[in-house]
């Protein structure tokens, strides 16, 4: 992520100081927000994957929501509560205030996935910005401080706070170049991770062979 952060600053500068003087748009001019669902322990009938605060960790992207936990509901949620590819989800409320305001992008594809009431979903409805670019804007320290206002941490995130955020809108070709860089970086990380897993498996096999 440090490589991605450095590349972002190099290409776009800090989104609050906006050194390249990009055109600014309010976040809610670019899409809409929806608070997540509140579930009840007595609900039953439909099991569905659900993104909760505990799933955020230090992730920037979840591309396989079938690995998320499931919740039981009485009915399938309406479309506005179902996550779609490119949705950005924020932590809205949490006992650990440092987690509030964290965000990630999801790509559930065909896996039906909802999100908990402790989250806010943002859905782009503008073709002026790409999800990968917007996510990195929202994860910068300066934008997180804007969310927090005068406090060190955000007490609770709400749609009013999000609506006050001003997002620089650079040219799409620049955003696409950044998205390609992010994609290549993720592929490299995945390749390295798989290689390390194979080495660990080989090491265990050799240890078993030599030492029983």
Regions flagged by a language model, labelled:
Residues 52, 79-139, 158:
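A short beta-sheet element
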Residues 28-40, 54-87:
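Sequence-specific dsDNA recognition surfaces
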């Amino acid at each position: 992520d440090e490589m991605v952060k450095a590349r972002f600053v190099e290409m776009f500068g800090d989104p609050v100081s906006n050194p390249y003087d990009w055109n600014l748009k309010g976040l809610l001019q670019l899409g809409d927000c929806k608070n997540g669902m509140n579930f009840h322990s007595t609900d039953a009938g439909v099991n569905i994957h659900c993104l909760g605060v505990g799933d955020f960790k230090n992730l920037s992207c979840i591309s396989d929501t079938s690995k998320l936990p499931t919740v039981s509901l009485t009915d399938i949620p309406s479309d506005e509560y179902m996550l779609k590819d490119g949705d950005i989800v924020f932590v809205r409320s949490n006992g650990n205030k440092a987690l509030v305001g964290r965000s990630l992008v999801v790509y559930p594809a065909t896996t039906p996935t909802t999100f908990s009431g402790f989250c806010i979903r943002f859905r782009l409805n503008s073709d002026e910005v790409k999800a990968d670019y917007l996510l990195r804007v929202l994860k910068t320290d300066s934008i997180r401080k804007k969310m927090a206002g005068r406090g060190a941490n955000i007490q609770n995130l709400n749609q009013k706070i999000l609506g006050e955020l001003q997002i620089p809108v650079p040219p799409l070709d620049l955003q696409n170049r950044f998205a390609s860089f992010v994609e290549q970086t993720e592929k490299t990380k995945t390749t390295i991770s798989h290689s390390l897993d194979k080495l660990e498996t080989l090491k265990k096999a050799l240890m078993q062979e030599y030492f029983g």
